Amino acid sequence: AHIWLTDDNGSPLIGEYSMPTRLGSTELKSFNHSVWIPTDHNTGKLTGTRLHVPIRFEKEIDRLTPYLFRAVCQGRVLKEAVIKMYKINEAGIEVEYFNIILENVKITQISPVLFPVGIASKHMEEVEIRYESIEWKYTDGNIMFKDSWNERVIA
């Protein structure tokens, strides 16, 4: 997976990836996110509306790192983050198949991570982000769903 970020002024924050189809992105080494809805443990009935857990990912420390620290330290809201996921198709070609588009993104935590010698050769960082809206898009068939905190959802 790769991420592209746009700052609060609408300018791209350029990552170090230089492959033409991923130019300016940053590779995500790990990614974790979930959405859940509260339910009664005995009956299974819904007791509230959906809740989004912050997105957490791990990436190599790179040219984006100071921009991410600036965003968290100054409370800046990034205009957009786009995460694109890839897979190998039946013909053996790598293709983009899933996107996550986030709007009004807040960097809420950055933690540099240094692994013991021999476990990883790169210096890494864990990043946590929150957002105002999220859209999930499966590219084959253009199947998508968008959720926004500004829209009231009744369970």
Tell where the protein language model's regions lie, with residue ranges:
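Glycine-rich, low-complexity intrinsically disordered segments
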Residues: 1-155
